[in-house]
């Protein structure tokens, strides 16, 4: 099943997956990307932003389908403007919208994409069979795509993105239109790609999907960089602690505001936002200093939704 993908090139850590330098793209009356500067490591990367944030524009620039107004972009260490063909040969692309010929079989479509990537016809057909098996379409590969469900069409699009043995696969909203089971199955497939030496850049507005399968997050909003970082570190340094000190909640919140720590009192419980473990130690010291009874102290990691909203809100504040 996975023999062909196991032969993918080894992952090299010398060059980042993406290197953007003041990357800007303007259309008449609209700045789609605004001086993005960031290095993104290899692995499974979530490209996060609301509709209109600039995700599709970035994909077009990576694929060489559009040219930046200013700045530059490197993919896998190669300048897209200098050698777009070399970049494209290392990429697979799964578009958001349905673009499959409905009268053809999945096997024929995926094999055709393999040949377009430069594979000999016989090799392409064998790879198509293996990849369709990998994505769970082995028994359906000779059926016309017109009879496929939404989930099966999404899997076919993923298969055509993988058949050319890419170093990086661009996934544009891969779980769009899927039911809960189909979504979980698609995310499981995305999670497996790293074991084959394939990096992933997954564009989505569903932060739960990113939190589930991505080890790095690139957040953009209105064409500007909001945050870039390892998923775990983003969540770890944005923890929230709920403290129960009985009727003294307001007194504790007032003292913590002097430190200062960000707090909110909800039904007598004090919620404290912490950036690191040192601030947790400060919280404990303040409780001891005031001599308050500590009935409960529980830690909850914030979600990526909260991280995104907090960073986006901070970015627009004067």
Locate the predicted segments by residue:
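Helix-to-loop junction immediately C-terminal to a conserved catalytic motif
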Residues: 63
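ABC transporter nucleotide-binding domain
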Residues: 185-274
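Conserved ABC ATPase "signature" region
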Residues: 111, 115, 122-140
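Catalytic Walker B motif of ABC-type/P-loop ATPase nucleotide-binding domains
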Residues: 169-173
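Conserved ABC transporter NBD signature motif
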Residues: 71-82, 87
């Amino acid at each position: 099943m996975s023999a062909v993908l196991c032969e993918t090139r080894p992952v090299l850590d010398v060059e980042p997956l993406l290197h953007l330098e003041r990357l800007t793209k303007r259309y008449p009356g609209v700045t789609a990307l605004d001086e993005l500067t960031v290095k993104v490591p290899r692995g499974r990367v979530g490209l996060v932003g609301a509709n209109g944030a600039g995700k599709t524009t970035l994909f077009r620039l990576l694929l060489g389908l559009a040219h930046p107004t200013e700045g530059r972009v490197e993919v896998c260490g190669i300048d897209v403007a200098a050698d777009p063909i070399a970049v494209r040969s290392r990429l697979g692309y799964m578009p958001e919208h349905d673009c499959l010929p409905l009268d053809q079989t999945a096997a024929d479509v995926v094999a055709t994409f393999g040949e377009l990537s430069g594979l000999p016809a016989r090799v392409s057909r064998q790879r198509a069979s293996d990849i369709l098996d990998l994505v769970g379409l082995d028994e359906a590969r000779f059926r016309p795509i017109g009879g496929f469900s939404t989930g099966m069409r999404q899997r076919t699009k993923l298969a055509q993105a993988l058949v050319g043995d890419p170093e990086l696969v661009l996934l544009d909203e891969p779980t769009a239109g899927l039911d809960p089971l189909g979504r979980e199955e698609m995310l499981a497939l995305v999670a497996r790609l790293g074991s084959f030496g394939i990096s992933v850049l997954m564009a989505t507005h569903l932060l739960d999907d990113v939190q589930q399968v991505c080890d790095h997050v690139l957040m953009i909003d209105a064409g500007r960089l909001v945050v870039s970082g390892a998923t775990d570190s983003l969540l770890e340094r944005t923890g929230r602690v709920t403290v129960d000190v009985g009727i003294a909640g307001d007194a504790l919140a007032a003292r913590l505001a002097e430190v200062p720590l960000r707090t909110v009192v909800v039904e007598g419980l004090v919620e404290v936002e912490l950036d690191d473990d040192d601030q947790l130690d400060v919280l404990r010291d303040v409780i001891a200093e005031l001599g308050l009874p500590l009935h409960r102290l529980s830690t909850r990691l914030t979600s990526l939704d909260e991280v995104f909203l907090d960073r986006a809100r901070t970015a627009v504040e004067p």
